[in-house]
Each structure stands twice: as structure tokens, then as C-alpha cells.
Amino acid sequence: MEEHERIRISGVINDVTFANPENGFTVLELESGDELITAVGVMPELKAGELLELSGYWDFHASFGRQFRVELCEHKMPASAGDILRYLAAGGVKGIGSKLAVKIVDKFGENTLDIIENDPERLAQIRGISPEKAKQISADFKRQFAVREIMISLEKYGMTTAECVKAFNAFGVRAADIIKRNPYALCGEGVGFSFERAEFIADQLPDPPDNGYRLQAGVLHVMSHNLSNGHTCIPREKMFAPCAELLSTNEETVDITIDELIGSGRLVSEFIDNREFLFLPHIYKAEKSSAERMKQILRFPPAGRKAADREIDRIEKKNGIKYGDLQRKAIVTAIERGLLILTGGPGTGKTTTLNGILQLFEDDGLKVALAAPTGRAAKRMSEVTGRPAKTIHRLLEVEWDKHDRPQFSRNARNPLDAQAVILDELSMVDITLFSSFLEALPIGCRLIMVGDSDQLPPVGAGNVLHDMIASGVIPVVELTEVFRQAMESLIVENAHRIVKGEPPKLGVRDKDFFFMRTDSPFIAAKTVSDLCAARLPRAYGYSPLDDIQVICPSRMGECGTNNINRVMQASLNPPDASKPETTVGATVFRTGDKVMQTRNNYDIEWTGPDGDGTGIFNGDIGILRKVDLRSRMAEIMFDERKAVIPFEALQELELAYAVTVHKSQGNEFPAVIMPIIGVPPRLAYRNLLYTGVTRAKKILVLVGSQSQIYSMAANDKKARRYSALKHFLLVNE
């Protein structure tokens, strides 16, 4: 039979060896006649013992041999008593095991499935099945086939198995009817389809949906797009042109649609300085509640006390240090007011000041919790304070709801067990996480927030640190004095020069800041790879994987992360028969690769020296230790945490020999290599350069164009972010 000739086969499932519930990818063994066939493809939820009719073609896999690639899967219910027994005994219906299956089929024979579906009370006649269990068995059976019926109804409109499951979870048994009437309901909360995807499905329907659904979904899509760009709100007039273009309509229609959305509560309107701004409701709530909680802390401050000079003198003597005036001011403010934003650049003594505050809190017998946005930032916080620190998510005891959204066990009803909380890397915290964090603070809890306002704003929406400082209502101490020991570092000196808009000193020998000039992006990429693979390890003994990090302004271009990751993978971890690999999209993942998690996944289980846990988060970097082609599982070490994930979860990873500046936030590395050449204009600004430079602890090498480095240092333009936290902090209700 010719390869890729489309055929149909039928048989009984012997075993489902792998199934990904998110995207429906399934590997199963099918008994077809006397042959045991491996079938792979996107299929609905299936159980051993079920009868299938499959359409597809034969293919050959390099590792697993001959396979049947499934393009269409049709389910056939078992009809004979023998087939029904086999189906139930294999776990085809939740709650029925092999022994119970024999009892049920012995009693009801070929009518078994009809009774489970339509007359479940009769199941309670069998010993071991209570009336409650009979109802649950029937409900699970109906749900299983409801999903399949929805798939049959909706797949002809281009919806995938995973999309059908999402629709069922959101809308239940009415999913098909709802989608046929209004496919744009798929864009709503809890489903999460893109507007473009809903448009495609709408185009496949025999009867076009009401245009009002489309208009409202389009406006909300533009709002969500602005949210993904960091804006918590947007001026109303700025919505007209992009919405009109997207929807091929006029601005008056957009204006009317916005009013309808405000009237139905799907948008919120707020006037700020006599200008109307629009919010998505959950972001409006997050920003407003954050401001209200901060104002509550200001109105009813924690019980402070006078900080005696002799106490600070004692800490100085104990630690062999001498605080500057601003450091003393920060310590006094923290002790006396219990609320502080501590900010400052590298070398200004934030860590030393923080440790002084910690010591006085502990001397007062306070229970102190330390937190940071990312795992690496929390680990670094632990290292510099000598005390345990957690990610914000772990501190708040995150859980995962049925729509894959984080829910926190710690909240206003179940606040944190702490009398003081210190939050580091505040510049990285977006407004939704900050709102959840503030909600979990107990009444009277002291709050110390630390961050560098010159760094990039968070990847998520909002500009929390900047807005709180700009409001002027929260106590802020900015450390500006760079201590003599820190000024011996050219990294520190140049970081402060960049912040001031001055060109960094390049070409200074025998320091920790190096520059390698080239005007060729191709040569720059090769130089970066050579520095990481050979020159820095040879000169300083650094590990290319553990100690050196390449940080790029952009993903695209010769010196973007996409290309440099390919170049460095070929150099540091080339193909080898002893290193199994698998391909996901355009990326080859090979045993030994350096990888990064690109989204929060709260379900991944891991084991570590201090116990087990769940959750790997956006920005976590690890090493791919094992790629098991037979089980289709991968083992990754994230620092000291070992996680084993299915191949399908690899789509949440990317190679991390090189990462973007945005992804590097909150991390520090012994050595950083940063190519600066051909940087896109939208990224060629000062705080991006500054953020990249300050990721290096011991060695920094810039590779590329001197003129571009100088122009980035001079460019104080920042991407405009619309946010309202400052407004809500200042407004009097």
C-alpha cells in the first residue's frame, strides 16, 4: 500500500498509551482483525475496549516504526454483551472496575449501556452500587458522550478536539447550540479563544450570527490586545480607529458598541483628569482594590515604634558596616511607619539596608515573610538575606481552577500568617498579582517593598512601582549614594551612567565590563557563541550552562534569541546518538539543552531536596536531563527541582541559551553576554539597556555597535503605558 494513501480501519482499543487532555493528541493500540496497530493523532477521550472506525494513512516513525496517522475518529458503541463487558472492564465508564463490570453485564446483558444512560436506578440492584454511586456512574457516562456529540456537531465547523472540550467545560451540554448561535461566545472568560479563531468558526456556520455579537467581541478583543501590551486602561477615543479597522465598520458604530458594553458591565468607564478611560472589569477591580488597600494601610498603619539610633549603631557594629544617611532613613521609616518603598540602583546598598530592617523586625519578635515574583528572584533573595523566600504564587498558596486560572488560598478571608512581609523586585509585579498579594495581607501587617524604578515595567499589565512612587502618598526612600566598593565595578559605574543618559565607558581593560566591537550582526552572533562556549569558560572557569547567560534585546534577527539559540545549541549541545531529541514546532529539544518555561503551569509536579511541590513558572530556567522517546516524557532540572513532563508540555518551553531582556528580569547571572546591534527602534531605549546590564554580577560583555549602545543610553523614551493606580491612590471617594 502506498504511503499516505487514505484508508479506513476499524477495531477495538486494546490500550490508550498516551493522551493529552489539552490538545487531544492520543497514542493507542488498536486490535484490528489479527493485527495490533499503533494509531496516533488528535482524538476525543477514549477508553480501552471501545470500538473505533478510523480514517487516515500509514506512516513510519524513526523511533516507533509503522503507525496509523488518524485524521478522523468515529466512535462505535459496543453492542454485544462480550464487547460491553470488555469495554466496562477496561475502565470505559468511571466508577466501574472489572469485577463490577462482570456483575452488571451478567444481570443486564446487551441492555447494559442503555440502563446506565437512561435507567441508572436499576444499577443499585447490584451489590456494591449505592443509589448515589449509580447516579454518578450515569452522570459520568453521559458527560463522556455529551463531549463526543458536541465534537461530532462542531468539528465540521473547523473546531479541534481540544476546542470542543473547552467549549463543553464552559457551556455544558448546550455548547453546540450556543456556538451555532454566537460563536463569539468562545472569546469569553473561561474559554479564551482568539477573536480571529471565532471569526473563522463563524465563517463556517451555515447561518451567519447576529452582527452585534461580532462587534462586541471585536471591541473586547482590542481591549485585550492593549492589556497584553501592558495597559490597564485605554482612552476611549483611541479605541475608535483600531476597532473600526478590525471590524470593517465606522467609528460611530464602534462608539455605540462601547456604550452597549459599558451598559452590560463588560467594560468599565472612568474619567481621569477629564478624559474618559475604558477598563476590562477584572483589571478595573484589581487596580482600584489595590489603591483602596494601600490607602487603608495608610489610614490604619501598623503599630510602629521609635527606632533608636543605638539600635542601628548596634547592627552596624555587629555586621562591620557603616550605613549612609539614606539607608538610616529607610530603616527608621520601616520601623516607625511599617510601610516603605525602598528603591535605588546597583551598588546603593538596598540589600544591606534590607538586612538591617529584617534584623530589627526579628529583634521585635515579628514573624517575617519574604517573597519575590519569580523562582530565581526568590532564590537570590534567600541567598542575600540568609532567610527563606518564596515566590508570590507559592506564598499565596496558589491553586488552579477549571478554566486554568490561578486561585489563591491566601486571601482576605484566609490572610497570610505574617506580621511583616518584604516583597522584592516590585518592578516585575503586574497589577493582578499585586492586587491578590495585598488582599492576603493581614490587618496591621508591615509591608516593605523593594525595587528599581529604572528597570523595565512588568511583562503583565500595569506599572505598579512607578505609579505608587509617582502618587507621592506612600513613603519612599530612594538610595542614590553609590558606595566606594561598588564603584570599583565598571558594571555598576556604567549602569549609573546609562540611567543618567551618559554613554557607558567602553574599552576599559582589566575591569568587569567589556566591549567587543563589530558592525556585522552575523559576526556578532558568532562572537557571542564563541564567548559562551570557549572564551569565558577558559578565562574564568565559568560553566556555559550554569554561569553564563546570553541576553538579547529582541527575539528576531541575527542577534535575536531565536537565531542565537540555534547557533549555541549547535555549538554547546550538537546532535549525538547518545542524546535523544524531539521536535516541537520549529524547535528541537535535545537531552542536555538549556530551557526556559514560558508560562505559569501550576500543575507540574516536582521533587526537590527540601520536599515535593507543584508549579513551574514563567521565566524558570532548567536543563533538559532526559528525553524518553518511548514514554514520550521529558525530565528537566529547574535548579534543584526535578520535573517530569509529557512531550506535549514541551510547547510551554523554549531554548534558553539566549533569553530576552524582558525574560531575564528578576535574575542575576555571574556572567552576561549581550549583543547590541540591529536592535529594533521600538526596543532601543535606555531602560532596556539598563535592565540587561544590571543582570550581570561579575562579568558583562557587550558585543556589537558602539553607536547603537550610545544612542540607547541617550534614548529616555519609554513605551507608554496607560494605567490608573496613581489616579485611584489620589482620588478621594
Put a short name on every predicted segment.
Residues M1-R310, E733:
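Accessory, non-ATPase domains that flank or precede helicase/AAA+ motor cores in DNA-metabolism machines
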